Amino acid sequence: MTQDEMKKAAGWAALKYVEKDSIVGVGTGSTVNHFIDALATMKADIEGAVSSSEASTQKMKALGIPVYDLNSVDKLSVYVDGADEINGHMDMIKGGGAALTREKIVAAVAEKFVCIVDNTKQVDILGEFPLPVEVIPMARSYVARELVKLGGDPVYREGVVTDNGNVILDVYNLKIINPKELEEKINAIVGVVTNGLFAKRGADVLLVGTPEGVKTFTA
């Protein structure tokens, strides 16, 4: 089974967490694109979706899935999204696709977070994948200096502007022993919008595509 086939298996497996007549929170990325394809097969049974990125919004609209503004929605029963890394405690690094802020907002609203990945994303300790940090443009150099003080090696992601009009610093060489603590420390730096650690709001369910099929883990 190829990596993409494992992603597809995880994406389709997430359908069972979608409630009838509900509004579904939808993330961003290659694995989520498979989930969106799956969701389109039951679009008549759901009210619609809330999206974490312009890219996912466009894909869902093209498939005929109604997309709602989060401000018009009282609750989301489930949010389905991928991860760049996830550990055994359901803490994640996300934001490789630069949609981390909106992803974090939608995840905060949802009652259940279902994370869909292939088996290459499971790690013991977070940090081998560089940690994305969304930053107000004028604060980029200041924030980079503060991240160095935390032991990281920040690199400006050239040519990338987030859906919110901000920039991304990718922080290398962090061995993240306490994800919740580091998430709070980085978010406390003036000029940081948010960072890609999802530890305060981790996943509730993890669906992992493997060569043997989809494995399910719960928090």
From Swiss-Prot:
Record's keyword terms, sorted: Isomerase
One GO molecular-function annotation for this sequence?
Answer: ribose-5-phosphate isomerase activity
What GO biological process, any one, is recorded here?
D-ribose metabolic process
Q: Which reaction does it catalyse?
A: aldehydo-D-ribose 5-phosphate = D-ribulose 5-phosphate
**Gene Ontology cellular component terms for the protein in this record:** cytosol
EC main class here is isomerase
List of catalytic residues: E103
Q: What is its EC number?
A: 5.3.1.6
Q: In which pathway does it act?
A: Carbohydrate degradation; pentose phosphate pathway; D-ribose 5-phosphate from D-ribulose 5-phosphate (non-oxidative stage): step 1/1
| Entry keyword annotation includes Isomerase | yes
Amino acids binding substrate:
T28, G29, S30, T31, D81, G82, A83, D84, K94, G95, G96, G97, K121
Role according to the record: Catalyzes the reversible conversion of ribose-5-phosphate to ribulose 5-phosphate.
Hey, which family's this protein in? Belongs to the ribose 5-phosphate isomerase family.
The protein's name is Ribose-5-phosphate isomerase A
Organism of origin: Shewanella sp. (strain MR-4)
